[in-house]
């Protein structure tokens, strides 16, 4: 009798053990599936308008958006073009741009609240005119581009620092009235031309470095830069064309030095329009 009872209890215990083990396995499997299930954090499609092929952001329509990560969104990360006026007058404060981005249209962010812009593209980006004019950007690291468009950052009063990528031309008024900018370092950028009034009225800029590749400096390029006392021009194969002598007029009594390659000092001093600044021109200190 005892043997039968003991055998029955052992059988019951084994069944209970198998049941609990199976239940635990099923629970763990469900939990794992739930954990691994992808979470869709995409921005509601009603917040924006895309082109039919999904490659152009035509317009941002949500008026309350302040932060946007386009690269983190499965649809917006495919965008390669931001159309003209897309974020104009919006409350957007920060944006992380997609890796595929190739073009930003005219006035795309003009008069918006944007203060932080992050570029992720490895390819050159084409900028439209005045795309970031009158915004709150404080510092920016620019991607490689053929040209920094006319008036691109004009009136960005809070812009203190710019890190330039490769660029061939800086357009007219590109940084005009960026009154917080403290220095302009264009060394090793491959820059060929600076447009008219490109850095005019950058009132706090104390130093500017122009690369060996510079060939043309436009009229009033650095005019109204009251404290710009140190300008280095590294071009030595030929003296760059200075379109007007007023390129460096400060509007103040600041004592300014223009440093040029030691072997070309006299060439600079005697070149058209440069001769106006012959007393300020001196050799680069090695």
Regions found by a protein language model. Name each.
Residues 1-52:
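Bacterial Sec-dependent N-terminal signal peptides
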Residues 46-52, 63-81, 90-103, 112-126, ...:
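Structural signature of tandem-repeat unit edges
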Residues 55-60:
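A short, structured beta-strand/loop element
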Residues 84-85, 105-108, 129-131, 149-152, ...:
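Consensus positions within tandem repeat domains that build extended binding/scaffold surfaces
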Residues 245-251, 272:
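A structural signal for leucine-rich repeat
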Residues 274-277:
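Extracellular interaction modules
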């Amino acid at each position: 009798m005892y043997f039968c009872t003991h055998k029955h209890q052992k059988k019951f215990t084994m069944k209970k053990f198998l049941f609990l083990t199976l239940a635990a396995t099923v629970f763990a499997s469900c939990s794992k599936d739930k954990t691994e299930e992808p979470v869709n954090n995409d921005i509601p499609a009603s917040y924006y308008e895309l082109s039919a092929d999904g490659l152009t952001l035509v317009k941002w329509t949500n008026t309350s958006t302040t932060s946007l990560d386009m690269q983190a969104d499965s649809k917006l990360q495919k965008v390669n073009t931001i159309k003209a006026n897309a974020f104009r007058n919006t409350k957007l404060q920060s944006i992380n741009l997609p890796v595929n981005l190739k073009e930003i249209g005219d006035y795309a962010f003009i008069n918006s609240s944007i203060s932080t812009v992050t570029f992720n593209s490895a390819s050159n980006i084409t900028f439209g005119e005045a795309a970031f004019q009158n915004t709150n950007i404080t510092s920016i690291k620019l991607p490689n581009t053929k040209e920094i468009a006319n008036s691109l950052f004009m009136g960005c009063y809070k812009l203190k620092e710019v890190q330039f990528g490769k660029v061939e031309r800086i357009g007219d008024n590109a940084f005009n009235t960026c009154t917080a900018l403290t220095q302009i370092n264009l060394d090793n950028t491959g820059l060929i031309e600076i447009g008219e009034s490109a850095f005019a009225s950058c009132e706090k800029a104390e130093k500017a470095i122009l690369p060996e590749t510079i060939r043309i400096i436009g009229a009033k390029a650095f005019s109204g830069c009251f404290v710009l006392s140190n300008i280095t021009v590294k071009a030595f194969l030929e003296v760059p064309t200075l379109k007007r002598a007023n390129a460096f007029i400060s509007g103040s009594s600041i004592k300014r030095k223009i440093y040029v390659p030691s072997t070309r000092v006299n060439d600079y001093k005697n070149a058209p329009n440069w001769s106006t600044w012959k007393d300020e021109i001196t050799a680069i200190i090695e």
